[in-house]
UniProtKB/Swiss-Prot annotation:
It catalyses: GTP + H2O = GDP + phosphate + H(+). PANTHER family: ELONGATION FACTOR TU, MITOCHONDRIAL, ELONGATION FACTOR TU-RELATED. The modification Phosphoserine is found at residue 312. Interacts with NLRX1. Interacts with ATG16L1. Keywords: Acetylation, Elongation factor, GTP-binding, Hydrolase, Magnesium, Metal-binding, Mitochondrion, Nucleotide-binding, Phosphoprotein, Protein biosynthesis, Transit peptide. It is found in: Mitochondrion. Residues 55-251 form the tr-type G domain. It comes from Bos taurus (Bovine). Residues 64-71 are annotated as: G1. This is Elongation factor Tu, mitochondrial.
């Protein structure tokens, strides 16, 4: 089981060096002008500010069950830091900025904001908690260096709390800080202590250091409304201190050619087409040639501008959450799931060999084994693609809890390379997590596989 433990605990892109990479493609709503993310709205006009890299950059995000207060906490953080010039205050309504999100009172797609503490610069992703949008949440958590798990004191851990922790663990998010929210709604201190105990047990169950994990009790709403400083302001300050100290600054791979999995594509009037995402590795400079690969596309162009949170950059580094303006392309030419890379540095593959851990029922996986030619969906980077699983010769069944070498054949060639991690899902269930070990050529037999 040592290999199984490795697959469950190793950072997602150990072979690529840039830390976790986006895994599960979201169910994108039709894009509207008012729904442009905070990240790239500034590209609609010439940026007036230049991003100054004077502090370590870290990607964090809020995860947790629906309506436990993730977006309220995100807004409270920006409000408190804005008073010292470390952020621009973002109201709840600005973070949940799509009409259907405001109408339902839940976050559907991950939203990005930025802020700075005395020690660090943060890109913060507010991840959706509703069960229907778990795939969107994972697109948000995948580039994260650490998470803030939000749990309501009056509810305790709930179904999406478990699922978010499981998925975050599978994709290599190794450091979690906990904020027990809505403490103002609970009169009994023993109930809060029980919730904390339950959270520590849950963290330990999913492979985190439950006894060492910082847990801060407070109320994001009190902080936002500037009342009860002990539960409000001071709790958020304690949380930020814990994030600064407990979540380490990751080592970025700046030596390899740049690789940007495309998260979203936007058409900016008067400027052109912008792709957004988190730079997985390397350095991207204004004026660099690039190519878009995947989904049967191979398009070459030039990066004419780079911005991060309304500020222009001459160069972006691995870990930066950015928008890149590209020359001569229309929005319909590009799509989520493509990869923007240095020309010639990477190529799509349709067949891979991989070491795969099959999740048990207790881990949220399948109840039953599967056979050769079983067809789940593979998620890696920002793409997902149907694939056929071929079991090793002499192996008739793949059992939950097994760690084994499999061959996977994709419906279309996608960006895959040695060391790349992926997740397998069947319906709304994560059934396995794997690591690519080789990318062999397709045989004639492989090419004749039926997909209907």
């Amino acid at each position: 089981m040592a290999a199984a433990t490795l697959l469950r605990a190793t950072p997602l892109f150990s072979g690529l060096g840039a830390g976790p990479a986006p895994l599960l493609q979201g169910l994108l709503r039709p894009l509207k002008a008012q729904a442009l993310p905070v990240l790239c709205r500034g590209l609609a006009v010439e940026a007036k500010k230049t991003y100054v890299r004077d502090k370590p950059h870290v990607n964090v995000g809020t995860i947790g069950h629906v309506d436990h207060g993730k977006t309220t906490l995100t807004a409270a953080i920006t409000k408190i830091l804005a008073e010292g010039g470390g952020a621009k205050f973002k109201k709840y309504e600005e973070i949940d900025n799509a009409p259907e999100e405001r109408a339902r009172g839940i976050t559907i797609n991950a939203a990005h904001v930025e802020y700075s503490t005395a020690a660090r610069h943060y890109a913060h992703t507010d991840c959706p908690g509703h069960a229907d949008y778990v795939k969107n949440m994972i697109t948000g958590t995948a580039p994260l260096d650490g998470c803030i798990l939000v749990v309501a004191a009056n509810d305790g851990p709930m179904p999406q709390t478990r699922e978010h922790l499981l998925l975050a663990r599978q994709i290599g998010v190794e450091h979690v800080v906990v904020y027990v929210n809505k403490a103002d709604a609970v009169q009994d201190s023993e109930m809060v202590e029980l919730v904390e105990l339950e959270i520590r047990e849950l963290l330990t169950e999913f492979g985190y250091k439950g006894e060492e994990t910082p847990i801060i009790v407070g109320s994001a709403l009190c902080a936002l409304e500037q009342r009860d400083p002990e539960l409000g302001l001071k709790s958020v300050q304690k949380l930020l201190d814990a994030v600064d100290t407990y979540i380490p600054v990751p080592t970025r791979d700046l030596e390899k050619p740049f690789l940007l999995p495309v998260e979203s594509v936007y058409s900016i009037p008067g400027r052109g087409t912008v792709v957004t995402g988190t730079l997985e590795r390397g350095i991207l400079k204004k004026g660099d040639e690039c190519e878009f690969l995947g989904h049967s596309k191979n398009i070459r162009t030039v990066v004419t501008g780079i911005e991060m949170f309304h500020k222009s950059l001459d160069r972006a580094e691995a870990g930066d959450n950015l928008g890149a303006l590209v020359r001569g392309l229309k929005r319909e030419d590009l799509r989520r799931g493509l990869v923007m890379a240095k020309p010639g540095s990477i190529q799509p593959h349709q067949k891979v060999e991989a070491q795969v851990y099959i999740l048990t029922k207790e881990e949220g996986g399948r109840h039953k084994p599967f056979v050769s030619h079983f067809m789940p969906v593979m998620f890696s980077l920002t793409w997902d693609m149907a694939c056929r699983i071929i079991l090793p010769p002499g192996k008739e069944l793949a059992m939950p809890g097994e760690d084994l070498k499999l061959t996977l054949i994709l419906r279309q060639p996608m960006i895959l390379e040695k060391g790349q991690r992926f997740t397998l899902r069947d319906g709304n269930r994560t059934i396995g997590t794997g690591l690519v070990t080789d990318t062999p050529a397709m045989t004639e037999e492989d090419k004749n596989i039926k997909w209907s």
